[in-house]
Every structure is written in C-alpha cells, then in structure tokens.
C-alpha cells in the first residue's frame, strides 16, 4: 500500500485500539503493518492522531469532527473528517480542502495521479528544499520564514526546518486559525 516507507517507530497498540471503528480499515492496517514513519520520498508522514488532535481541535473549524492521520513536509495536516472525507488543512495559507470522499482511491491517487499531487502537495518545492537543506527528521517540517501570512514569499530562499507542531502553533497564533474567527 505504501511505497518507500521509512519506519520511525511502532504505532502504540492503545492508539490502534482507540481508533478502530473511527478511522477506515486501511488506516488501521497501515498503523499495524507499517507503524509511524514517512513515505512519498519523505513528503508525507504517518502520525499518531493523539499528538495532533488537540492542535487540530483548537485551530481548525472542523477540528472536533477530524482525526489527524498524516502531516506533509510543509506542516499541512491530513485528516479523516465526519467519518467520510479525507481533508487537508493548509495552515501556512490559512486554508483547507477536501481531498477525497472515502479511502477507495486515496493511496493510488497519491502515487499515480499527477493532477492530484499537484493540487494538494508541493513536491517540486519539496525536492528543491531537500537538496538545499537536507532531509527532514520525523518531527520536522519545512517552514516559511517569514510566515506566508505575514508577507513571506513561497520560495526556496524563505524556508527553514522546524518542529512541526511548534510551527503550526506559531502560524495560528500570529496569522490566525483555519476557518475560525477570533
């Protein structure tokens, strides 16, 4: 199912049990067979939902109906929403989108559909960033400095590595939450 998976560690058994029936069987299978780690050349990371759940609930208008599943190399969080949709939260741009209805074609689209990858992932910039700055650690993302919402440019020259959770909290504190007016 996941090509080029680089395992970081096992998904805790209690997390697998906690989310059975709440996430698609394909996700449970990934957690059981692959664990936590990265794929798509390190662009996507399988995460422990509990590590991101509070963040998503506090910073995204659909947060209470969302279960975080993956995070991208640019700190975008991919979620399972309303037991039906795969959503993506683009914190860096204060935006969100629905990637798919159900899991049926999600993984095949990631690997085989160029239009899908172009719409939701910035693999071209990621490739340049890895060449210039090196590969990311499991808990890191490429961060725009200054933040895009504060006038930063979406450019290879404006990237730095940082802790993913810290960076998302920083974005939401300085720029704003996604779909929530404070």
Task: Label the model's feature ranges.
Residues 51-59, 108-110, 123-126:
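Charged, low-complexity, helix-prone segments enriched in Lys/Glu/Asp/Gln
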Residues 6, 111, 120, 127-129, ...:
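Generic low-complexity, intrinsically disordered sequence content enriched
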Residues 1-88, 140-182:
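A surface-exposed partner-binding patch
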Residues 115-157:
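Mixed-charge (acidic/basic) macromolecular-recognition segments
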Residues 87-124:
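Compact, glycine/acidic-enriched structural inserts
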Residues 73-75, 100, 129:
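A sequence-composition feature that detects small, non-aromatic residues
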């Amino acid at each position: 199912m996941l090509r080029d998976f680089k395992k970081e560690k096992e998904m805790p058994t209690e997390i697998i049990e906690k989310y059975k029936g709440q996430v698609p069987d394909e996700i449970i299978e990934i957690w059981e067979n692959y664990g936590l780690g990265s794929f798509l050349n390190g662009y996507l990371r399988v995460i422990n939902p509990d590590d991101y759940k509070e963040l998503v609930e506090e910073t995204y208008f659909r947060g209470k109906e969302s279960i975080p599943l993956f995070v991208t190399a640019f700190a975008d969080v991919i979620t399972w929403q309303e037991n039906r949709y795969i959503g993506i939260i683009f914190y860096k741009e204060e935006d969100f989108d629905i990637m798919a209805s159900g899991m049926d074609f999600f993984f095949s689209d990631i690997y085989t559909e160029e239009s899908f990858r172009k719409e939701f992932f910035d693999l071209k910039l990621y490739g340049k960033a890895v060449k210039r700055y090196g590969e990311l650690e499991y808990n890191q993302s490429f961060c725009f400095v200054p933040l895009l919402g504060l006038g930063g440019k979406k450019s290879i020259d404006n990237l730095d590595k940082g802790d993913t959770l810290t960076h998302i909290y920083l974005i939401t504190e300085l720029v704003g939450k996604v779909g929530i007016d404070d």
